[in-house]
Every structure is written in C-alpha cells, then in structure tokens.
C-alpha cells in the first residue's frame, strides 16, 4: 500500500511540473526561446516527448504544438509556437508559466509587463472570432480588391471606381435612393480621403520591429495591444503582426520580423500601409 501511495504521489508531482518564459520581442521565435528546460524534460519519457503539447489558456482557448529535438535540447516547433504568440499578441516582456496537467496537456498563465495576469484574449482575437465578413452586393468590388488591382498597374495611372450604396426601403413607401461615390487615386503614392493610410521609411532597426511616430500613433493606431493582419498587395500572402503600446511609444512587434524577411523589406524602402478594415492593412513597398 505504501509503495502504491508513493507512486501516486510521484505521478501527481509530475503532473504539476512547470516552467516559465519571459518573452523578448527580438528573439521571440528563436530555438532558445522555444526550448524546454532540461530539468523539466528529463522527467518525461521519449514516448511522451514524441506527442504534441496541448497548451490551454485561462479563458479556454488551446493550441497544439509539436515537440522537436536538436543535438542539445528539446524545443517547441516554430509554427505552432508562433501561432500561440500571435493569437495572444505577445512579445513585450510578458512572463509566462506553463504547468503540466498530465498527458502533455499544459495550462499557461500570462502575466503582462505591469504584473497583471491576462484573463481574457486580446481584443482583436475575440473580435475576429465573433465577426463575419460583410456581405457585398453582386458586381460591387471590395476595397481590398480595388487596392490590389491598383498595385498591379504600372507607372502613372488614374482609376475611378464607382460604388453604389442602396438605402433601405422606407416603411411607408417602396422608393429606393442610390448613393454614388467615387475613389480616385492618381498613383501608388497618392493619398485618398476615402482610404486611411500612412507611410514609414525603413531604417535598419525597423527590420526587427517598427516604432511609430506620435503622429501615426495618435491618428491611426489603437490605444492597446492589438493583432493586425497585413496583406501583400497581390492578396496571396498575409501576416499576423502584434501591435504593442509601451507608455507613450508603440510598435509592430511579434510577427513583424518574419514579414520583413518574407516580403522582403530592405533598408531605404518606403512602406505605405492602407487600411481595409479596422485592424487589417495592405502594405505597398517602394524601392529607393
């Protein structure tokens, strides 16, 4: 009986094994950041380490992450880790604790830089989960399609697109009023009163994270941590990028470095961001 009791206690202790991480935006996707501590890993069998980790947050969302191995240590697979980081808008020195609950299931507790625990998902994540794409009348192009079409034109050009917006029928009559408005753009660098946009010049440090001037921050950006979806103009590639606010400063953090490498961006480029939704942008790049 005593031996069984000791075995049960050992199993319970193993279930409660835990480790922590402090997330720094510069190396948030590195193997070292994704590494599992040696003292933590050695209490698990090879069979257990061949399974996926299932990470569950306080509000119920969960993520599955493969476990990989190099000659020195075990670590969390990159795409699963980056999905977890992006969904939770992490990358600004958050303190995370991972607690094993058995069968490679983990709970994660996320503490912000100010010491407060995150008890609900970031605003944009809950917004995206609850929202649906708006319906469009047949034959009317979306703004995203309009901007993508512009980016494929060459040299100087001028496009004028008419959008029709039908007003709802009045309750006492069947008259319908059509509103017609147009969006004119002279070139890829021209501004439009109908499209919110801003431009940034790429410096070397901006290939890792992009800091915004106060003028852009106050006019265009949210006042809290948010996940932005940034599209390539051809609309075939997009990136989830974390926008973080730290005091009076703000920047694109987790996910931005990957975008800069894959787009790709280079020092001297001019980046123009055009809004197509509240937290969704198209990125146009002009080379020097």
From Swiss-Prot:
Single GO term (MF): DNA binding
GO cellular component, one term: nucleus
Classification via Gene3D superfamilies: DNA-binding pseudobarrel domain (2.40.330.10)
DNA-binding region, residue intervals: 19-114, 196-288
Annotated compartments: Nucleus
InterPro entries associated with the record: B3_DNA-bd, DNA-bd_pseudobarrel_sf, Plant_B3_domain
Domain of life, source organism: Eukaryota
Keyword Transcription: yes
SUPFAM superfamilies, sorted: DNA-binding pseudobarrel domain (SSF101936)
Pfam family membership, one: B3
Name under which the protein is recorded: B3 domain-containing protein At2g35310
Organism: Arabidopsis thaliana
The organism's taxonomic lineage, starting at the top: Eukaryota, Viridiplantae, Streptophyta, Embryophyta, Tracheophyta
